Amino acid sequence: MKSVLVVGLGRFGRHVAMKLDELKHEVMAVDIQEDRVDAALPYVENAQIGDCTNAEFLSSLGVRNFDVCIVAIGDNFQSSLETTSLLKELGARFVVSRAARDVHAKFLLRNGADEVVYPERQLATWTAVRYTADHILDYIELNEEYGIFELTVPAEWAGKSVGQLDVRTVSYTHLRAHET
């Protein structure tokens, strides 16, 4: 179990906090809007109303004690950048920040983010691949060249060994199968 600070409780931050709770992690959530904090109370250990661009407030949360700090602010890049930078200055161990554009990611990485996520881009890629390719049930992009696919077995593959399929001549592919 990890302790996670989620800053920003818009759609993305709220869903991250809910999933972390479902995975049994300890979650503290922070947002400047009281209604968002109130809505998060059922699925977080602790929730605070406050401005995370304020160093004193952010310091009062004990950011050094969290395994991961997730900056989920999506509607105000300046606040996201300031919060990311302050978290690192205050000793946060690992900071993940949300970006909408590559230029945002560059600034976030230069100012303290250990990693950057692009929720809209990542979901758009998953949706496009998942719903336009035959046999794909799920997809995880590892980088621009590699991905992991869960797929149904095409009829023409049934009863054949991996060697008989010769998938490596089509692309650099590794298969791992399991019965369900």
Q: What function would you assign to each model-found segment?
A:
Residues 20:
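Aromatic pocket-lining residues of Rossmann-like dinucleotide-binding sites
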Residues 173-180:
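Conserved small/polar residues in nucleotide/adenosyl-binding loops
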Residues 43-45, 49-127, 133, 152:
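Phosphate-bearing ligand-interacting subdomains
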Residues 9:
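Glycine-rich Rossmann-fold phosphate-binding loop(s) that bind the pyrophosphate
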Residues 27:
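Short beta-strand element of Class I
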Residues 13:
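N-terminal Rossmann-fold NAD(P) dinucleotide-binding loop
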Residues 31:
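Conserved acidic E/D residue at the C-terminus of a beta-strand in Rossmann-like folds
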Residues 37-38, 105:
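Short alpha-helix immediately C-terminal to the canonical SAM-binding loop
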